[in-house]
């Protein structure tokens, strides 16, 4: 990381670098680590289970961008957030994501959080989540296809 940042620090071209790991180790690896610490899945609290799905990230730029520290977010928003902070115009899909983030700051396979901080089941937010899933599918697989 240090070498990469040092290289771009004085570059003339505006540069944004995102350091992000997409998940924690697999269950097989995590089970071994837990066992070596006298723990098992059966004895983890709900909060400890959730921590497995939290991954730190760092956004660095060689110019001033809007910064946010310690924000709870989810991977589906990260690209749109970085582009917005970098001053890059967002396409319609990423604009939609930034709007959705105001209502649901976290959407993941294991938890969905509303703007007020309350956790909800995605299945209980069916209408909004169905729209999101359809748009996400279109963006990933059908982009440019006329239906």
What are these regions (language model features)?
Residues 1-147:
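Solvent-exposed soluble domains appended to multi-pass membrane proteins
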């Amino acid at each position: 990381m240090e070498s990469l940042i040092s290289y771009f620090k004085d570059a003339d071209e505006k540069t944004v670098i995102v350091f992000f790991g997409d998940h924690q180790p697999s269950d097989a690896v995590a089970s071994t680590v837990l066992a070596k610490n006298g723990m098992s899945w059966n004895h983890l609290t709900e909060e400890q289970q959730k921590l497995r799905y939290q991954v730190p990230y760092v956004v660095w730029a060689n110019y001033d961008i809007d910064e946010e520290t310690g924000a709870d977010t989810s991977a589906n928003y990260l690209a749109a957030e970085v582009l917005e902070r970098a001053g890059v115009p967002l396409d319609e899909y990423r604009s939609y994501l930034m709007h959705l983030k105001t209502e649901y700051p976290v959407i993941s396979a294991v938890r969905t959080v509303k703007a007020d901080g309350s956790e909800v089941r995605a299945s209980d937010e069916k209408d909004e989540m169905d729209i999101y899933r359809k748009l996400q599918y279109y963006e990933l697989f059908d982009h440019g296809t006329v239906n």
